[in-house]
């Protein structure tokens, strides 16, 4: 979905940062992916409706990914109880991580271009 409004360079930058700040996970392994977008969104949500939408989308996706990761962890744990389940558990974990990284990068690029981005499999907690 393309946004038809004229966006300033600052709006595009902060829209991109809403998504890209999820990479804070690599600095703060415990929920850095949630705190990064949350901080950017809270700072800029009242200054631009578009940045507000991008921040909500990014934050909802990161919260969704935490839930999916917890579910995957339990599934992986159960699978590792069987010898054949270990490779499948590794594939599940890697698949989820790759999906997350690709989605964050795609959203960041789209936002930097001034386009709205909707994450797949996103649970919309914040509307």
Residue ranges and their predicted role:
Residues 1-65, 104-127:
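Membrane-interface extramembranous regions at the lipid-water interface
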């Amino acid at each position: 979905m393309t946004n038809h409004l004229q966006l300033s360079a600052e709006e595009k930058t902060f829209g991109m940062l809403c998504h890209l700040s999820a990479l804070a996970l690599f600095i703060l392994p415990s929920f850095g992916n949630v705190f990064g977008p949350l901080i950017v969104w809270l700072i800029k949500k009242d200054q631009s409706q578009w940045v507000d939408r991008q921040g909500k989308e990014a934050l909802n996706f990161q919260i969704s990914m935490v839930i999916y990761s917890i579910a995957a962890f339990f599934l992986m744990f159960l699978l590792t109880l069987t010898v054949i389940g270990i490779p499948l558990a590794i594939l599940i974990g890697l698949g989820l991580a790759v999906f997350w990284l690709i989605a964050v990068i795609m959203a960041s690029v789209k936002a930097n271009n001034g386009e709205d981005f909707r994450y797949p499999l996103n649970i919309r907690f914040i509307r």
